[in-house]
């Protein structure tokens, strides 16, 4: 793994670049987390909620129909869509709310794009009876209305953010501001592998259950490892969790799929690894989509969860080291894959995951029937059906 040093760096990426007012809170979080990782009661409690609340381990499914129709390699799915709340996000929120409880916090906040992290945060807020506030861009509130309703039903206050592009970046900025103002009683449950140290490490550790389970399950069924592992990448939490299980297996190729949007022009995609440059965003040093003056360029994706102009610092490290290959799929390709997976396999995937499916289709056709591709099915697509229907004008063929 791209093991971070004491300052929270992965190679040249990472670190802690935050306002002075957050320094003590970040140090407290780091110190508490280090202690809890060694605490038997914490580990037992986390395992209890993973098994009895989230429903882990999530299944490994052989996608027989996709394998037959696409041709080439066999397709396997790690079913994070079957977790409680419908995505991988609950893996992280359940862990972080236990940290918040250990620190004596009474209020939790979060940012969300597609709304799945917001729902997962609202869920643990309800279960642990903590005041919960979720920041969400107005554009994302429009295209992910179902999840906004779910959050409110769970008791969370949903705050629309209209600044900037009114998407994930802006929601994250507002959540950071809230945390700075209410740091004494509030824990910020960062939803992706982004932010100042120790957030990228904490999120990766809680999501690593995906890859650890996947490796064990796949080997048990096939008596070998997959040839390729594919996951979508926005900030990158589902991908970093999936890759964790295979990062030391050099023969397993790892692919991160970003959002190619509708063109390669600035402002029309979220392909940070391909088009980004080293910079600073939300408290970390990473690859960022920016102009020649260092200003953040607006990102775009048909998928709200991938609509982010940065990427987790560990992904930036894996790109630079060459261990993971990062590619991108455009909006239309993702929409096509969304409908195709529905029709062929009877699974409605999240639009985020649809990017991974589209790339897997192309890759599978370059491989033999004896080879295997494992896809992280990061979430279900109930939240996306209205937006897909709108974009395709009700035509699904």
Swiss-Prot record:
Pathway: Amino-acid biosynthesis; L-tryptophan biosynthesis; L-tryptophan from chorismate: step 5/5
Cofactor(s) this protein requires: pyridoxal 5'-phosphate
Cellular component terms (Gene Ontology): cytoplasm
Keyword hit for Amino-acid biosynthesis: yes
Presence of keyword Ribosomal protein: no
A Pfam family that the UniProt record links to this protein: PALP
Catalysed reaction, written as an equation: (1S,2R)-1-C-(indol-3-yl)glycerol 3-phosphate + L-serine = D-glyceraldehyde 3-phosphate + L-tryptophan + H2O
Entry EC no(s): 4.2.1.20
Domain of life: Bacteria
Modified residues (N6-(pyridoxal phosphate)lysine): 89
UniProt keyword annotations, A-Z: Amino-acid biosynthesis, Aromatic amino acid biosynthesis, Lyase, Pyridoxal phosphate, Tryptophan biosynthesis
InterPro entries given in the database record: Trp_synth_b_CS, Trp_synth_beta, Trp_synth_beta/beta-like, TrpB-like_PALP, TrpB-like_PALP_sf
Primary role: The beta subunit is responsible for the synthesis of L-tryptophan from indole and L-serine.
Protein family: Belongs to the TrpB family.
PANTHER family per the UniProt record, alphabetical: TRYPTOPHAN SYNTHASE (PTHR48077:SF3), TRYPTOPHAN SYNTHASE-RELATED (PTHR48077)
Subunit structure: Tetramer of two alpha and two beta chains.
Record HAMAP family: Trp_synth_beta (MF_00133)
Protein name according to UniProt: Tryptophan synthase beta chain
Organism: Leptospira interrogans serogroup Icterohaemorrhagiae serovar Lai (strain 56601)
Gene that this sequence comes from: trpB
């Amino acid at each position: 793994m791209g093991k971070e040093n004491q300052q929270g760096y992965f190679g040249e990426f990472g670190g802690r670049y935050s306002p002075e007012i957050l320094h003590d809170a970040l140090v407290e979080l780091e110190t508490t987390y280090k202690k809890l990782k060694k605490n038997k009661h914490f580990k037992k409690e986390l395992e209890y909620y993973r098994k009895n609340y989230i429903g882990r381990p999530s299944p490994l499914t052989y996608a027989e129909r996709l394998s037959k129709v696409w041709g080439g390699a066999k397709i396997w799915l790690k079913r994070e869509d079957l977790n409680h709340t419908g995505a991988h996000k609950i893996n992280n929120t359940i862990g972080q709310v236990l940290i918040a409880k250990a620190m004596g916090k009474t209020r939790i906040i979060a940012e969300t794009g597609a709304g799945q992290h917001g729902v997962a945060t609202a869920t643990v807020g309800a279960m642990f009876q903590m005041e919960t506030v979720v920041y969400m861009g107005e554009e994302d509130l429009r295209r992910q209305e179902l999840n906004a309703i779910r959050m409110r039903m769970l008791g969370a206050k949903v705050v629309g953010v209209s600044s900037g592009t009114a998407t994930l970046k802006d929601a994250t900025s507002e959540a950071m501001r809230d945390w700075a103002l209410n740091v004494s009683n509030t824990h910020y449950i960062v939803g992706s592998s982004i932010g100042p140290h120790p957030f990228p490490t904490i999120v990766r550790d809680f999501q690593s259950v995906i890859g650890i389970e996947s490796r064990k399950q796949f080997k048990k069924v096939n008596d070998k490892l997959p040839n390729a592992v594919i996951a979508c990448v926005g900030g990158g939490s589902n991908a970093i969790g999936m890759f964790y299980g295979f990062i030391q297996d050099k023969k397993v190729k790892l692919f991160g799929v970003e959002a190619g949007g509708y063109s390669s022009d600035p402002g029309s995609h979220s392909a940070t690894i391909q088009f980004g440059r080293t910079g600073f965003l939300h408290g970390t040093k990473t690859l960022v989509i920016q102009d020649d003056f260092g200003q953040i360029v607006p990102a775009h994706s048909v998928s709200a969860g991938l609509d982010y102009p940065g990427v987790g610092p560990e992904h930036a490290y894996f790109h630079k080291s060459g261990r993971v290959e990062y590619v991108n799929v455009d909006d239309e390709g993702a929409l096509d894959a969304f409908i195709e997976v529905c029709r062929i396999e009877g699974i409605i995937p999240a639009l985020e995951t649809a990017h991974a499916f589209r790339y897997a289709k192309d890759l599978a056709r370059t491989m033999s029937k004896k080879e295997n591709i494992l896809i992280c099915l990061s979430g279900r697509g109930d939240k996306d059906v209205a937006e897909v229907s709108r974009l395709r004008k009700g035509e699904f063929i």
